[in-house]
Each structure stands twice: as structure tokens, then as C-alpha cells.
Amino acid sequence: MIDIFLFVHITISILLIIVILMQRSGSGGISGISGDNNMGVVSAKTVGNFLSKSTIILTTLFLINAIVLANLSAKKQSDLVSKINEIEENQADNSLPIAK
């Protein structure tokens, strides 16, 4: 289960990096690579709005996924600690000498 969320987390991270780099900044960013200032049917404002909304959505998904991963990891660690304690108790009980 954690593997699935980890894969989703990595995918969201990569998409978030791409979307952030595509946004126009003071120096133009990666969006200026195409060389076309004339966007044709899609205006620069529309692309900017789409990238802004995409960034917000991906950031929200990233944070939610990070919280879920943290909770799953904490639960898995607590289960592991309880199993270790149980094994230690069983070994301690088995190693005690029996008085006759």
C-alpha cells in the first residue's frame, strides 16, 4: 500500500516540477523555449491561468499524499515496535529457568 502512495508521490513531484518550470517568470522560464511569442488560439493569459490552477491542484495533492504517507509509515513503525516487544517478551518467558 505504501508503495502505491510512494509511486503517486514521485509522479506528482515530477509533474509539479515541470508545471512550475513552465510558468513564466521574470526571465521567461522554460515557457520561452518554444520561441513563439504568438500562441495562436491559446493566449498567454489562458496558459498562465491553466498553469497556476495546475500548480495549486498538484500542490494540494502532494501535501495530502505526504500526510497519508506519514500516517501509514507511523502506523507501520508502531506495528513493528509492538511485534518486536512481543517477540522479546516471548523470548524472556522461554529463557527463565523453571523452579522444581
Swiss-Prot record:
Which chain positions lie within coiled-coil regions? none
Q: Does the keyword NADP apply?
A: no
Q: What transmembrane ranges does the database entry give?
A: 1-21, 54-74
The answer to whether keyword Flavoprotein applies is no
Against InterPro entries, the record matches this protein to: SecG (IPR004692)
Q: What Pfam family is a match, any one? A: SecG
Keywords attached to this entry: Cell membrane, Membrane, Protein transport, Translocation, Transmembrane, Transmembrane helix, Transport
**Topologically, how does it sit relative to the membrane?**
Multi-pass membrane protein
Any one Gene Ontology cellular component term annotated for this protein: plasma membrane
What is the recorded function of this protein according to its Swiss-Prot or TrEMBL entry? Involved in protein export. Participates in an early event of protein translocation.
**What family classification does the UniProt entry report for this protein?**
Belongs to the SecG family.
User: What protein name is recorded for this chain?
Assistant: Protein-export membrane protein SecG
Q: What is the gene called? A: secG
